[in-house]
Amino acid sequence: MENTYVGQRDYRFNVNQLSYRGIRRRKWGKWVSEIREPGKKTRIWLGSYETAEMAAAAYDAAALHLRGRGTNLNFPELVDSFPRPESSSSEHIQAAAQDAALMFKPGRLSEPALESGQGLSRVGLSPDQIQAINESPLDSPRMGWMQDLEVADYEELYGQFFGQHDRDEFFEMQQFQSIWNSNN
């Protein structure tokens, strides 16, 4: 059975491929995670997961418990968010790993919170909401705030983002008539 090992240096793989410690990809697409018990030749099976991130989070929860806070983690910014096993038994480590993996389950409304309390979030829209957005005209009342902005507001906003030099160049170019507006 051939596995794609992630986390080790192998130049056969695409340079852009994500790599995480303690995981590998099965040829049928599932990601698996396991960790070696310190001082032993045995491994603790942490599970099979849908995504690499789920498997990597499972590994991190186990590594944090077995090796301590000084160990290299896949998601070091989440060290305080990972579940802790009740004991050092393989069953408790596996349970904590499963819980950590669920933090990254696809379809969750938000990613795990970072130490600062600021996490990435996803907005889930229903098919009806997406259809309503696609069907509303660009000049609908919902877009009215754009019409309320004066030219001075645009200049100020542009200057804040791109600097004075670029702003002046941009508005200088705006004085020339666009080829799309010509009546030729």
Swiss-Prot record:
GO cellular component entries: nucleus
Pfam families registered for this protein in UniProt: AP2
DNA-binding residues: 19-76
Chief location: nucleus
Subcellular localization(s) per the UniProt record: Nucleus
Coiled-coil spans in chain: none
GO terms assigned for molecular function: DNA binding; DNA-binding transcription factor activity
Keyword field: Activator, DNA-binding, Ethylene signaling pathway, Nucleus, Transcription, Transcription regulation
GO biological process annotation, one example: ethylene-activated signaling pathway
Signal peptide (UniProt feature, chain positions): none
Family: Belongs to the AP2/ERF transcription factor family. ERF subfamily.
Reported function: Probably acts as a transcriptional activator. Binds to the GCC-box pathogenesis-related promoter element. May be involved in the regulation of gene expression by stress factors and by components of stress signal transduction pathways.
Protein name: Ethylene-responsive transcription factor ERF022
Protein's organism: Arabidopsis thaliana (Mouse-ear cress)
